[in-house]
Design a protein with these regions (language model features):
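Residues forming anionic-ligand binding surfaces in small-molecule and nucleic-acid pockets
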Residues: 149-168, 207-246
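Phosphate-backbone binding interfaces of nucleic-acid-interacting proteins
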Residues: 1-202, 206
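Alpha-helix capping and helix-loop boundary segments enriched in small/acidic/polar residues
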Residues: 173, 231, 250-253
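Conserved small/polar residues in nucleotide/adenosyl-binding loops
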Residues: 259-262
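Hydrophobic (often cysteine-bearing) scaffold residues that line and stabilize catalytic clefts
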Residues: 17, 178, 236-241, 252-255
């Protein structure tokens, strides 16, 4: 079962690193098969702000001058993308950087013009639309306008996170959810568990168009059902899409996704 570190932090005030929490879970009998950093394979990729652009004659390339903060304010990088504009902030993989899949970026000439790195799409960073909006757009990943040039890309796009891949044993069905693991983490760290706030009001409607009949009360002494009206199908909120994506699930719709989360 995949459990995002960031999701656990929503339930518990965790004051240890992911690696330290992994050791504590092991010591309490949980088998953490793998601790996966979301930014695995990514190094020396920073926020770059495009300060100059010029179309390279006779090619599909655009020559860009990129402000990468402490790494340099006038780094020249060519790109074949066409969806950026002057002033945009984009991921810049600098000379000597690495990307997922073992890809190494080096300064080289593109159509005879020196390029000191690569401007990246969301896909090249291992992102998808559910993890970070705009990641599946054809072209470069356009970052928020307030992104600071030279900042490491991981926290900007939400890759500063870890996934605990935990094997749940048959005697711990209570831990087959993120909330179940969070409850254990709270106990391990001696911290309070912050349960999700409920802001809906249940109304008893005796004339609801459903009935529930338990035909074997000796086997099922209690059964509960909720009838929900006025549901509007649509997209799930961004936070829910991200939670599901981190657990390896794809967002489908607000109704289906809520069932997956619950």
């Amino acid at each position: 079962m995949k459990v995002p570190f960031s999701w656990l932090k929503e339930y518990v005030d965790i004051d240890v690193t992911a690696q330290e929490l992994e050791e504590k879970l092991f010591s309490c009998g949980f088998e953490v098969e793998e601790l996966i950093p979301l930014d695995a394979g990514i190094s020396k990729v920073v926020v770059g702000k495009i300060v100059e652009m010029e179309k390279q004659e006779g090619t599909h390339l655009t020559k860009c001058v990129v402000d990468c903060g402490d790494y340099g304010h006038d780094i020249r990088i060519s790109t074949g993308a066409a969806n950026m504009k002057l002033g945009d902030c984009v991921p810049a993989a600098l000379d000597g950087s690495t990307l997922p899949g073992g890809i190494k970026i080096k300064a080289r000439k593109m159509q005879g013009v020196e390029s000191n790195g690569m401007l990246c799409s969301g896909e090249e960073l291992g992102l998808n639309e559910d993890l970070f909006p705009g990641s599946e757009v054809y072209g470069l990943l356009i970052l928020p306008e307030d992104s600071v040039p030279g900042t490491d890309i991981a926290p900007v796009v939400g890759l500063d996170d870890y996934i605990f891949d935990i094997s749940i044993t048959a005697n711990r069905p209570d831990c087959q959810s993120v909330l179940g693991i969070a409850r254990e983490v709270a106990a391990i760290l001696g911290k309070p568990l912050h349960m999700p706030a409920m802001d809906y009001k249940a109304v008893c409607e005796p004339d609801a168009p459903i009935t529930v009949k338990v035909e074997a009360p000796d086997l099922c002494p209690r059964y509960m059902a909720h009838y929900v009206r006025n549901i509007r199908m649509g997209e799930s909120p961004r936070w829910m899409k991200r939670h599901l994506a981190l657990c390896g699930l794809r967002s489908i719709s607000n109704v289906v996704d809520r069932k997956s989360v619950v």
